[in-house]
């Protein structure tokens, strides 16, 4: 991997330094199956150097949890974190169908390894991790079967 993570900041914020750009986030919009998927990208403060690892965080069944606490912890240690929502969930376009979820995860992973994404968010295309919680764990596992270049998977209480 191209950088060192700062695990000491997993559960607490880094000390304030007015000379360092603060951590921030932006909205994302990615196409999958002809629909626009909405979400956010969170990135760490400017104290982290070099291209960063990036995580695609996939929630479980819509309406359950977005896992904001996990996204914030990963950002604090130096990861870029994308939290996206499948077609028809949390305001994304299209109709929610379980059968679309794997396609959505795969489309997001391909986009997050693209030169445009990596340049815009200073991430390493060879350090993309997928994390899935509950039904998101199953979606991540299935998407990984048809997605090249992933660094790793983390399944949290996966549901099949």
Predicted segments, located by residue:
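Glycine-rich nucleophile elbow surrounding the catalytic serine of serine-hydrolase chemistry
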Residues: 132-142
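Alpha/beta-hydrolase fold nucleophile elbow
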Residues: 119-134
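Active-site nucleophile loop of the alpha/beta-hydrolase fold
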Residues: 154-160
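The serine-hydrolase catalytic nucleophile loop
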Residues: 60-73
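N-terminal cap/lid segment of alpha/beta-hydrolase-fold proteins
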Residues: 2-49
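Conserved alpha/beta-hydrolase
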Residues: 75-93
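Short beta-strand element of the alpha/beta-hydrolase
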Residues: 50-60
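Alpha/beta-hydrolase active-site loop
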Residues: 96-122
């Amino acid at each position: 991997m191209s950088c060192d993570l700062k695990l000491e900041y997993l559960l607490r914020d880094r000390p304030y330094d007015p000379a360092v750009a603060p951590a921030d986030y932006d909205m994302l919009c990615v196409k999958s199956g002809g629909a626009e998927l909405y979400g956010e990208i969170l990135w760490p403060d400017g104290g982290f150097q070099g291209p960063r690892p990036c995580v695609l965080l996939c929630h479980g069944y819509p309406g359950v949890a977005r896992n904001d606490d996990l996204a914030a912890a990963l950002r604090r240690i130096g990861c870029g974190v994308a939290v996206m929502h499948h077609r028809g969930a949390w305001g994304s376009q299209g109709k929610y169908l379980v059968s679309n979820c794997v396609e959505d995860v795969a489309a997001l992973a391909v986009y997050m390894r693209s030169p445009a994404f990596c340049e815009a968010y200073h991430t390493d295309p060879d350090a993309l991790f997928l994390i899935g919680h509950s039904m998101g764990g199953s979606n991540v596992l299935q998407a990984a079967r048809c997605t090249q270049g992933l660094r790793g998977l983390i399944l949290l209480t996966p549901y099949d």
